[in-house]
Amino acid sequence: MKGFAMLGINKLGWIEKERPVAGSYDAIVRPLAVSPCTSDIHTVFEGALGDRKNMILGHEAVGEVVEVGSEVKDFKPGDRVIVPCTTPDWRSLEVQAGFQQHSNGMLAGWKFSNFKDGVFGEYFHVNDADMNLAILPKDMPLENAVMITDMMTTGFHGAELADIQMGSSVVVIGIGAVGLMGIAGAKLRGAGRIIGVGSRPICVEAAKFYGATDILNYKNGHIVDQVMKLTNGKGVDRVIMAGGGSETLSQAVSMVKPGGIISNINYHGSGDALLIPRVEWGCGMAHKTIKGGLCPGGRLRAEMLRDMVVYNRVDLSKLVTHVYHGFDHIEEALLLMKDKPKDLIKAVVIL
């Protein structure tokens, strides 16, 4: 089968591989729509996961089941499915401990284009199909559905990790697709003031659509200073880190109130350390909590997020700005995420 792959660090190309084989609990899926992610860019061009050779990329897809293993009960060939980017091994001890994302090892719930070939192939393998797939509604646009698989679950996880309370003040650093879903999740959880940090006009408009009450442009000065000025020197209750570089943790610690929570859902693909400023951390005694987590996956979460879209709690249409048609456009769509033109939020390829 054909697939678009990481050939090595800074190397991309089309390759031929054997079609994957389904184990007794697994499924083989043919992608119907895929979306490149900035995580793919970190993986290929920063070597964030190491020097992977001939690994098919991609972890955001909806598709059609073409084969199931003998023990799969709830899905059959022909079913159209949502495939979460995180597909845990549900028989692992880490799942029993409450951390499905790290089943059988740190970040090992994220398998596609990490521990095995991803979804940018003519077919891809899904482990534990009954536990990791969700039925795709017939009338849901494919470009919206594929946003559930990563952008929605990741952004919402930022709001979950931040433990946003009714009326909480929140800063969301980065208003790309994940940050936009962080804003949407914060609003749904009852946040009061939601401050988005970003600069591209198309993202600013989308941030306001999803619930941002204020927008700060990092090009207009240090964002900590801007947040403090906006809040009369008090800072905010919660910070969601959804973009930016290694400096964002220091910024988040500086702008969150004592007793506040910082939630990181950003993929830090380069650098050896993330620095915590000593004084702003109260010399280690400010009761400022720092959390970071890979998004949850699995069938139940995918079904719940899907239903939020079906019942009009969240409109995902603002996330997708570029739609391509045809397998051969995957490379073009991926490089778009690297170049980040001003009119881009997310690109989707319909297959």
From Swiss-Prot:
pH dependence, record text: Optimum pH is 8.
Enzyme Commission number, as recorded: 1.1.1.80
UniProt keyword list: Metal-binding, NADP, Oxidoreductase, Zinc
Lineage: superkingdom: Bacteria
Pfam families: ADH_N, ADH_zinc_N
InterPro entries named in the record: ADH-like_C (IPR013149), ADH-like_N (IPR013154), ADH_Zn_CS (IPR002328), GroES-like_sf (IPR011032), NAD(P)-bd_dom_sf (IPR036291), PKS_ER (IPR020843)
Entry GO MF terms: isopropanol dehydrogenase (NADP+) activity; zinc ion binding
Protein name (Swiss-Prot/TrEMBL): NADP-dependent isopropanol dehydrogenase
Native organism: Clostridium beijerinckii
Gene: adh
